[in-house]
Amino acid sequence: GVARKNKGSIGTAIVQAFDMTAASTGLSERILRMNGLPYQVIHVSGKDHAGYYPGAADVTLKLLFEPTSGKIYGAQGVGKKGVDKRIDILATAIKGNLTIFDLPELEFTYAPPFGSAKDPVNMLGYAALNLVEGLSDNIQWYELEDELAAGKKFLDVRTASELQQGRLKVDTVHIPLNELRERLGELDKSQDYIVSCHSGLRSYIAERILKQAGFSVKNLDGAFALYKMVKPEGVEYGN
């Protein structure tokens, strides 16, 4: 035989439970914390293919990375379809020593039945860059309770109809994103805010609007879509 060096495994795995799929690759947040490694986390929720094409399913991805070099430590994903594809891509990125700076530029086959013009993996890269470039500051779902107890206010920028379909069980200031610029006077610049929407895109836009207007604000990473999955007891429905 030919002598070849085994470079080891990064622990890529997948499991199906009924109609849901969960997969992971690389290091988890728990392992990073146990080893005292510096890291940042970003969550992105998207569709397995173009949302306007029939049959699109939600895919939620989590990326862990080193905040200075952008080294990708690991990733996890959950959803009904398309999770295997994204985790396989991210596992290949880790093995190939790609960083978060490479993810927005990755190119995939595209047609509406198969993917989106910007794949959720691309969006992970953009969201991670927003953090390391100082355009965004986020908090994780498990930090929300302590942040609110410390005096921060929760701002939801979804529509009124979205709030009726589910909201967090916290004291909430509600201003839809399309009304935010006109209603900035209703907010207190001496107050710190945590902003949220459904999946994180609109709350990022709101965060940028508020910061440019002189407010102190952080984005709830993963927003409502993630929170209702990981802490369903913290969500209420109806009026």
Give, region by region, the residue ranges found by the protein language model:
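Generic non-transmembrane alpha-helix signal with a bias for helix starts/N-cap capping motifs
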Residues: T25-G26, R86, S203
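Short, conserved beta-strand edge motifs with alternating hydrophobic and charged residues
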Residues: I42-H43, F154-V157
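Rhodanese-like catalytic fold shared by cysteine-dependent sulfurtransferases
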Residues: F101-P112, S116-K153, A160-D192, H198-N239
